[in-house]
Amino acid sequence: FTQANFFNNTQTRKILAPEVVARQGITLEQLGQLLGSYAVEAKVYHSSDTHLEQFRQLVAQNLSQEDNFVLVNYLRRKIGQERGGHISPIAAYNQQTDRFLILDVSRYKYPPVWVKAADLWQAMDTKDMVSGKTR
C-alpha cells in the first residue's frame, strides 16, 4: 500500500475518509480499524499498556515472522524530527545496539533511521491529542 491507494477499499472509506486523515491525522485505534478492513489481523498496543522491555520482545518476535509487520505511532519531535504524531513501519531491530530501524512513509523527507529503543519508546509514550491516549 501507499498513502495514495490505502483508501481505495470501499470498506476503508466507511471507517474514515482520506480527507479527514489529511486534515487531522489518525489515531492508533482508527489505524487498527482501517487495517482490519483488509483481511488482516491488526493488534493495537498503546505504550501505557506495555513497557519498554515488553515492546522490544513483541517487536522482535513479530519481525522474526514472515508476513508480519509492525507499525509505530510516535511523536516525531521526540526523536529529533519536525512536526507531530506520525505512523511508520519498523523494519528491523538490532539487539547489540538496542535500536529499531524505522522506514519512514514520508521517505521523500525522512530517510530510514536507526532509533534507540528508549528514545522510540519515549516518542510513543506521549498522548495523542485526538484520542487522549498514549500512542
Identify the residue ranges that each predicted region occupies.
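Cysteine-nucleophile protease catalytic domains, especially the papain-like/related folds used
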Residues: 1-50, 132-133
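Short, exposed beta-strand "edge-strand" segments with a Pro/Gly-rich flavor and a Y/T-containing core
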Residues: 19-28, 46-50, 83-84, 89-93, ...
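Extracytoplasmic/secreted proteins, especially bacterial periplasmic and envelope-associated proteins
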Residues: 26, 30-33, 54, 58, ...
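Sec-exported extracytoplasmic/periplasmic mature domains
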Residues: 36-43, 64, 95, 125
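Ordered hydrophobic segments in well-structured contexts
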Residues: 43, 69-71, 135
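Active-site-adjacent substructure of cysteine-protease-like catalytic cores
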Residues: 50-101
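Noncatalytic regulatory segments and standalone regulatory/sensor domains
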Residues: 95-135
